[in-house]
Each structure stands twice: as C-alpha cells, then as structure tokens.
Amino acid sequence: MTNRILIVGAGICGLAVAAELSRKMPTTLIDRLPVIGGITSGYENSVAVELAAQCSANGVDFLLGTAGLRWMDNKLLIAGPATGLRWLDGSHLVYAGGTRPSTAAELRLLGARLAGVYPAMVAYHLTESGVKLGLRPVIIGSGRWAKRVCLALAKRRCRATVISSDPSMETDFATTTWLGWLPVGLHGYGRVAALQAEREGMVQTINCDAVVLAGILRPMRNIDGAVFDNAQENNVSFVQMLSETANETDRARFGRAAASAVITRIKGITNES
C-alpha cells in the first residue's frame, strides 16, 4: 500500500487539510475544477491563495481538473483531460467535497414536482449567465448561498423574498423576509405559483414565480465506495463543514482541526497493522 494521502476537494477545507497533512505524509490534492478555492470562495480568495502556497511549499501534488470517481482497495479511480482514466494508489482518502443545499424532498415540501424550482447553485449560475428566473422569486434559507443568489437576482431587478425557519438569521440582502416561518408546500399548475409557510399553527401563502432551495446544508457524497457508514473499514475521512454562515477563516480553522483528527486516526490504523 502506497503511503500517500489522497484529498478530494480543493476548497478552503480541502486546502487547509492538505496544508497540515502534507507536513507529515506525501499528499495529493484532487478537484474536478481546474482551479483552487472551490465554487464558493474562488481561486482569487486570499485565504485560498495562502493555503495553496503552504501546500506547494510542502510538496503537495495538485491534480486539478480531475474528478475522483471510485474508492476501492486503497485506490482512487480518477478521470480528467490531463490524467485520463486511471487508478491512484493511496493509504487514506480524505473527502472534502463541500456541501449542498437540501432538496425539496429533504425539506419535506409537499406538492407536485413543478417547474421553476431550482437548487441554489443552479439558480446562481443561470442568473450570472443572464437568465431571469422570475420577477418574484422566493429563496428558502438565509446562509451564504441564499445571500449569493439574492445578490445575483438583484442585478436582474428581481424582488427576492427570503424565508427561513431560523428567526435570528441576518437577511439584509433580501427585499422581503419571512423569518421564523417553515416552508411546507409548493403550489401551481405546471410551474410554481406559490409557497406555503407555517408558524405556530398559522399558515400563509407567498405568491411567487420561482423558488430557490438554499437552506440546510448537507454533505456532498460524490465518490462511489467512499461511504460514511463504512468509513472506518475503508480508510476514509470526511471533512465537510455544514455551517451556513462560516466564512473562509472559519472553514480554514475547521480544516486544520480536522487534519489533526485524521493524523490521529492514521496513526491508529498504522499501529493496528
């Protein structure tokens, strides 16, 4: 077995983990994007640039523009235009592939599957590309993805409404806010026309022509074989921060702390073998 750590995800958490682990063991950092920083921070972010410099100084092998597909028998199947399709040997896999907002099913929204309901990442990229999702969109959630989508919608002169079950969240980026309300259902014929919300037995209907799902972050799971339930047996560690409000400094701190836990676990595995 090759004594090398494989890290999938070159966002802030992945970079922070790589910067720490590479001081102890040979490390390879893999990301499907051709640049560092992930989809939320970007390659120009100062924290990402600083962490990448530390990784380079420690001899981290960067495989950007490369997707990790399958983890099996301490080998990672990777694919990319430069690497092709091949297996990469590693003694341990660290998955730092980030998070995603909950789906309509995970939010337990009742109603038919209607057009005009978008995951936050899709809504953001469409809006940035010039697509107008609607005139009166509703954004479910109030974290960084909700803010990012709202600011993009504002450039298209959309009157965005933010709804969140957390009454303490700051939402100064929205035109209208419904804090402390729980979204429970979607209504419309073919396309979404209204969102139903509930609070303390009261039910309200919010008219809209688009809904963006940007709330309650959940961990990505994109590598076949890297399953959380079998992580102990498969030499896999997961480093994913579920906070909706954490900034880059918070995520870097989280990644460094997680690296210490990974090192402790690897030492335990080595001692057992």
Question: Model-predicted segments: where are they?
Answer:
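Residues forming the flavin
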Residues: 1-273
